[in-house]
Amino acid sequence: MKTTAPRTQIRPVTLPDGVSLRRVAQVLLEAWEVGAHQWTGTPLQLREGASAKPSLPLPQDALDLFRLLADRRVDYLLVGGLAMLTYVNGRNTRDVDLLMSAATLRTIPELVIVEESEYFARAAYRSVQVDVLLTKNPLFKQVAQKFATRHRFAELSVPAVTVEGLIVLKLYALPSLYRQFALDRAALYETDITLLIAQHTPKLEPLIALVDQQMKPGDQKELQTILAECKARATLLRQRAGQASSITKPSA
């Protein structure tokens, strides 16, 4: 197996308050450069053939997307991987995830819709892939109404989901991921939830209660178990971080 060498230096993946939107563009580019499409001769490719290579996300396109949304005063929230990076150090993400209504999406002709279902749409803004969560889903609508904040970039502030909203969205997605045997994504989502709990200690009871309203009884029980496990791992992480800090702290 071979892979193309990345052209840019991979940096710590985070989007702290006040960082330039150009960092968003770099995150998307770095994710593209280490993506699975760079590998050749894998068993899957040999068996099924290579899939189409995604387009290279151009940095200027990512900047222009957020400027367009701001100039049009679009009612939306930044969610998904980029929103995660405003709260924790994490992994690269190759697309922009937005939450908005279907009616709002229709007012942005520059977002070319590639696929659409009842609650989701996949679109493209020039070279940038944009995944859209639609507020026709009752839970997504509640997230938009109850869990909105703003993240300040150097150039402008962007409407973004809160820590609590991210946890709600990830909990909601987990049963479907497990039914699809998308175990890699399910594991990543559980890790995301654990990190958000460990670093921000949100109140979890109202969040699971909100998600439960949209779940079948069997899924409700499983999510309670998953959330308890994430909470326990978060507690253990904080304990170990505290122990490491006390060990390395210089004596007076």
Q: What annotation goes with each model-predicted range?
A:
Residues K2-A252:
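Compositionally biased terminal segments of proteins
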